[in-house]
Each structure stands twice: as structure tokens, then as C-alpha cells.
Amino acid sequence: EDAYIAVRKWYDERKGVKDAPAGEITDADRKAFQDFYFDTYMRKVTEVLRKYDPNHLYLGCRFNQHHQEMASPEIFAVAGKYMDVISINHYRLWEPNAAWMADWEKWSGKPFIITEFYTKGEDSGLPNNTGAGWNVRTQADRGWFYQNFVTELLRSGNCVGWHWFTYMDNDPQNLRTDPSNRDSNKGVVAWNFEPYTVLLDEMKQLNDCTYRLIRHLDAEKAKANRKTTE
């Protein structure tokens, strides 16, 4: 089939012989093929987007896997060739990894945007059995998580935005939805449109001073840099 023929051609060219033995495939070969595969995918998608929709930014495919994607210099190097902004769904950490964020910029040369992150409150009355976000005890804790997480994004200097996932809680009465997206407190409003005011107040507190916070963090960073060069 076409896929096998393409892989075989790539592998033979990499090994420099025809019908290179499959039993000699190494981890380095697997890594190289992953990079080749991703580059091919990104190139084809980008060519079509640039042709038919040249005036919009391409945000990519929302990286999510820690070791396979978010800690991979090769993946980010490819992403930097094609994406305008690199999109990332950020889970499984209480705050973004500062070293990773610095590496993303170094590896790709592009800014990033966080396209998903959230926590679920145990005081919501929902079971919170589904979803990638972790559980916290209260809506206030959700708000403090938000403030800390976003502050670290701003501290990085290379984040251009963030999206809380999601606007509304899963409706526990709607059994037609996917079971993995049915019973959790992900939203800033409940499934009946009642706002989580404690959470929203904490979010607003940070959002209202975002630019002042950026200036403060940049000044602190510049001050630290001056000290290291003295």
C-alpha cells in the first residue's frame, strides 16, 4: 500500500541500501522518522492554508504530550518552520514548566499560546470523574490556580495568550454527550449558566492588572540580568 511504500523508501534512503532489514531499525531511526512524518504533515497543511487563507495566523495542532511533544526540540524546530504561534494544551502540572517555556522559544523561534488548562472544584456538586484537569477543593482554589498559572506564563515573556477550558460545565443530565465529557466542573459558569463568582473574581483580579504585571516581571528580569553581568 502507499503508506508502506513511502516508509520503505524513506528507510532505504536513510540506511543507504535497498530493502534495508527491518530488524536493524534503531531508536534513532524511529526518532528520525517521527520528525520526517511531522515535517511532511506540517508542510502539506501549511501549503494549503497559505494558498486559500493567507491572511490568518496558523496556530498548529495543540501539543499535549509531555515527552513526545512538549520536551522535544525536534518537534518544536519543525513547528517553528510552519506555525505562526505554537498552540499547547497544558495539563498534568500545577504550573507551566519555566525551563520548557524557555526551550520552546529557543527551539522554535516562535511565541506560544496555551489553548487549554483548568482545574475542577470539589464544591461544585459534580462528580469530577472525567477530564484532564486536576481536582481542587473550592472555587477559590481554582481561582488561585489560575492566577499562579497565568503569572508564570507572563513571566516567560514568550506567551501571547491563554484559554481556560471551558466556558460551561458539562451538563450531567445530557446523556447524549461523550462519557469522557459529562460530569465535571470545567467551566466558569455551571451547566445552568450560573456563574462561579468566586472563581471569576480571582480571574478578573489578575486579568485587570495583566499589563502592569508584565511590566513588573520584565523589570525584575532585567534587574536580575544586570546583577549577573556585574
Which sequence ranges carry the predicted segments?
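Aromatic- and acidic-residue-enriched segments that line the glycan-binding/catalytic groove
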Residues: 1-19, 172-189
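Short glycine/proline-rich turn/loop motifs
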Residues: 17-30
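Glycoside hydrolase catalytic-domain groove-lining segments
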Residues: 23, 32-47, 51-131, 151
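Conserved residues at the C-terminal ends of beta-strands
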Residues: 89, 162-165
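Histidine/acidic-residue-rich catalytic or RNA/ligand-binding cores of hydrolases
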Residues: 123-133, 174-183
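Surface-exposed substrate-engagement region within the catalytic domains
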Residues: 132-152
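Aromatic-rich peripheral "rim/lid" segments of glycoside hydrolase catalytic domains that contact
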Residues: 165-230
